[in-house]
Amino acid sequence: MAAAEPDADPKAAIPVDLRRERRLVCVEYPGVVRNEAKMLQTLGGEESVSRIYTDPTKRLELYFRPKDPYCHPVCANRFSTSSLLLRIRKRTRRRRGVLGDEAHPQVTFNLEIIGIISTIYKFQGMSDFQYLAVHTEAGGKHVSMYDRVLMRKPEKEEFFHQELPLYIPPPIFSRLDTPVDYFYRPETQHREGYHNPTISGENLIGLSRARRPHNAIFVNFEDTEVPEQPLEAAVQTWKKACTNPIDQKVEEELRKLFDIRPVWSRNAVKSNVSVHPDKLKILLPYMAYYMITGPWRSLWIRFGYDPRKHPDAKIYQVLDFRIRCGMKYGYGSRDMPVKAKRSTYNYSLPITVKKTSNQPGTMHDLKQGLGPSGTDGPRKLTYNKYKLKDSVYIFREGALPPYRQMFYQLCDLNVEELQKIVHRNDGTETVCTERDGWCLPKTTDHLRDTMSLMILQTIRSERPALFSNTGKADRGKEQLMFESGEEEEEEEEEEEEEEEDFKPSDGSENEMETEILDYV
């Protein structure tokens, strides 16, 4: 705190104590604040403000009618700043019984720095239109419709058949709150006899650039033949991209992999070969074709090799495995020690703002790779830069998968008990079906049940607090055994009915669509 003396020079510097440890957040509230409690209520309360502050990508929302569930908020942008919050007190001391010039009051100013403001929220956008569900009665009185529309308690059937006035909301609300300049231009005037061109793909301008074709060949399970060689466009594309010795070495390594094993998943390739993802998109169509449906769906198969004609190809079949969760298994989705591949919270909304993250600074040794005389010597190439861990395609007992949904090939199930289930019919394979391939019917169901029990035991060892109630865990285990169809005949009948209308799981379709889009 510092006080200015009455006779001091107004331009003189005054020493002030600065509390560096006290950091504050400023909100430029678009209104006069007379009640702090009501002001915080319009911002969602202290809990909401704290939650938004912890996420730098969130915008602070202000609801002018916090009790109205349909109130459209005004959003504030977040900025970094280096400001001070000052408290200035003006004290006036009047002199009594003094006449003349000396009768002027004595004024002093007390200055105090409360803290440093490092973050500020500014409401720079425009407030959107607020549409109210209000009905005008015959006498001109406005009545709110919320009490008649909103369900605040369980209602009877008559509630849904009551007569209400027609209220049509606007067809669309604005997603942006910042104004933009729109330059109106007159309509284009064509000469007499001009006709608009026919609508076709050549005359349309897309919103984004066209995808680069990677010339992959897709094969369905019903197709009779498989391709023997890649497309000529795929060959030329790879020859143009293969410009250095590293690319040639990657090509040789991938060719050796397909010689050893004719069927590979993309994750398995990434775990065995260090290659840039963009180069892999071009190299895979040059080496193999892609199976869309059947037991080898979402896998890359060597040209000329047809797994439907080789019973020993059953070890390359794919298994869509998902970690089961729920009350009957003893843990929920939030308690699982395995993260999800995707999340809806990763998508941007109008109330969020994208900010580039600060890139950490890196230092490179310019002498690295040089010989003793300073000349360019043999450099140590980082071949493992793009390699993935083998856990993305290999299942091991006692280890949790990296994701909640995994696509394993049967040969990558490194558990003896699982391999016994796969090889139960070795030498007696007769027909290859779309669901089970060369394996016995319901082999995938038995594999999933066995793997789920292993996952349950692993989670129990890593998170024993989730299974403090042993009875619940035992019930979950019994439920797993019941789902496998070993105790009830009715369950077997239901599985037989489901087998007739077999379709690949939604998860596998989503995974294939993601990979197929890279080659369209």
UniProtKB/Swiss-Prot annotation:
Modified residues (N-acetylalanine): 2
Any one GO CC term of the record: transcription factor TFIIIC complex
Residues forming coiled coils: none
GO biological process, one term: skeletal muscle cell differentiation
Subcellular location(s) of the protein: Nucleus
Organism superkingdom: Eukaryota
Main location: nucleus
Quaternary structure annotation from Swiss-Prot or TrEMBL: Part of the TFIIIC subcomplex TFIIIC2, consisting of six subunits, GTF3C1, GTF3C2, GTF3C3, GTF3C4, GTF3C5 and GTF3C6. Interacts with BRF1, GTF3C6 and TBP.
Entry's family note: Belongs to the TFIIIC subunit 5 family.
Name of this protein: General transcription factor 3C polypeptide 5
Record lineage: Eukaryota, Metazoa, Chordata, Craniata, Vertebrata
